[in-house]
Amino acid sequence: VGLGVILDVVYNHLGPEGNNLKAFSADYFSHQYHSEWGESLNFDEENAAPVRAFVLANVRYWLAEFHLDGLRFDATQQLFDASPEPILSAAAREARVAAGDRGIFLVAENEPLLDLSARLTQRPRVQHR
């Protein structure tokens, strides 16, 4: 038909109000990072495994169960993760596996647009003499 569905997924924050996850474990949140919207999720500190597992399962779920055409990752500059495999890389890997033979779109919002981390997704420029 020519119409694709891309879901906006937000793994960088839960919101400043109504977040009750600390009642289950304070380790779900980072002890060193803070986002623009409140507490950051724990992707790279001690006991980060449950948070990482949840996010990766969520990525697989949307693509495998609903056959979405892609995911748009909200405000990736607020995903703080110094792991050997950062959560965004792991999510991209899992998304491709969940999609199987289907082509999918993975879009990473990054603000400000001139942020130097955006260079990681650009092709190297060829210098002409």
Per-region residue spans from a language model:
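Short, well-ordered coil/turn segments that N-cap beta-strands
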Residues: 2-3, 8, 67-69, 100-104
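Conserved, mostly hydrophobic/aromatic
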Residues: 8, 62, 73, 106
